């Protein structure tokens, strides 16, 4: 049997809509991600378990893990009879790359089970394709960091899908999931079809400056450039209490904050553990909406998807 863990990810990071994402892991050792197990069987079977298994589609063929198995078999040109188990530990529609976790874990597990017939680039292309079935368009800003680890910039040129951007060891990512669902497709539909020239210029300046600051090792500058003129002005209305939360975490000392992915998770970036804890405490009291919500203090997950059994 092969068991693969795929970590949560925070896409966009305010500054890089659809082209930037970071894999994250809680500092307390909690596993924030999905696990998929694969073993040989006489015919295909899929079993779901985990905290959020009851939120999955009741029809097995609608489960993204089934679709991953089906697409992987197509890529190999043969049917591979396996029993798969999805441990769904990630809330659906959370802005933490929940579907990417399932897609990445499933495809890596299948590839490991079959002796790695597909290389990383081919696997990543399949991951983007399958993630696109859920979100409505192919994009790699969750699947790439989830699969490869660290902070990833989408390239999509010369056969290169993404490349790693150096992060900062001192950065702590406070992630607050309020417990409500925001559909990725809905969050994309709310965005305008066209943008003003000044917004395009500002977006280009912020993203170019952020990447420069990462490579020139200027964490304060990098954090200051994490501004969103593309999605946040339109998506903030989908998130109860978001504007107040951003103001509060800034006053506490967060370097930057914004919407993780398409929301509703909020991320806040800190460079001191005590600041991160104060931010986490405030968000726990004021941003969470129900018992399904949670707050984690995280660092970059540099390993990405890995075999755990």
Curated annotation (Swiss-Prot):
Task: List the keywords (alphabetical).
Answer: Amino-acid biosynthesis, ATP-binding, Cytoplasm, Kinase, Nucleotide-binding, Threonine biosynthesis, Transferase
For this UniProt entry, what is the primary localization, expressed as one broad class? cytoplasm
What reaction does this catalyse? L-homoserine + ATP = O-phospho-L-homoserine + ADP + H(+)
Location(s), subcellular: Cytoplasm
Q: Which Pfam family is one of this chain's hits? A: GHMP_kinases_N
This protein's pathway = Amino-acid biosynthesis; L-threonine biosynthesis; L-threonine from L-aspartate: step 4/5
Gene Ontology CC: one annotated term: cytoplasm
- Family statement: Belongs to the GHMP kinase family. Homoserine kinase subfamily.
GO biological process entries? threonine biosynthetic process
According to its UniProt entry, the function of this protein is described as:
Catalyzes the ATP-dependent phosphorylation of L-homoserine to L-homoserine phosphate.
Q: What is this protein called?
A: Homoserine kinase
Which pairs are disulfide-linked?
none
Q: Where does ATP bind?
A: 91-101
Give the range the annotation lists for the signal sequence.
none
Q: What is its EC number?
A: 2.7.1.39
Q: GO molecular function of the protein, one example?
A: ATP binding
Q: What class of enzyme is it?
A: transferase
Q: Please name the source species.
A: Salmonella typhimurium (strain LT2 / SGSC1412 / ATCC 700720)
């Amino acid at each position: 049997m092969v068991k693969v863990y795929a970590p949560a990810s925070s896409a966009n990071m305010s500054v890089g809509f659809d082209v930037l994402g970071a894999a994250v892991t809680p500092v307390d050792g909690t596993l924030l991600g999905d696990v998929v197990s694969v073993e040989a069987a006489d015919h295909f079977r899929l079993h779901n378990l985990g905290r959020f298994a009851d939120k999955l589609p009741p029809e097995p063929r609608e489960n993204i893990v089934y679709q991953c198995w089906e697409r992987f078999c197509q890529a190999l040109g043969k049917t591979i009879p396996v029993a798969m188990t999805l441990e769904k530990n990630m809330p659906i529609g959370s802005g933490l790359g929940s579907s990417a976790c399932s897609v990445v874990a499933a495809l890596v597990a299948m590839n490991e089970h079959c002796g790695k017939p597909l290389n990383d680039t081919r696997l990543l292309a399949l991951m983007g394709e399958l993630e696109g079935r859920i979100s409505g368009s192919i994009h790699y800003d969750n699947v790439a960091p989830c699969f490869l680890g660290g902070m990833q910039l989408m390239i999509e040129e010369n056969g290169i899908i993404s490349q790693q951007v150096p992060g900062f060891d001192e950065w702590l990512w406070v992630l607050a999931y309020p417990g409500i669902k925001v559909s990725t497709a809905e969050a994309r539909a709310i965005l305008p079809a066209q943008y003003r020239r000044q917004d395009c210029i500002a977006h280009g300046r912020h993203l170019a400056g952020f990447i420069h600051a990462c490579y020139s090792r200027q964490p304060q500058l990098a954090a200051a450039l994490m501004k969103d003129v593309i999605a946040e002005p339109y998506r903030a209305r989908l998130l109860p209490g978001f504007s107040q939360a951003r103001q509060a975490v800034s006053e506490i000392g967060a370097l930057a904050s914004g919407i993780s992915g398409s929301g509703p998770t909020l991320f806040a970036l800190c460079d001191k553990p005590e600041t991160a804890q104060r931010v986490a405490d405030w968000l726990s009291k004021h941003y969470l909406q129900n018992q399904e919500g949670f707050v984690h203090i995280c660092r970059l997950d540099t390993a990405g998807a890995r075999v755990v059994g």
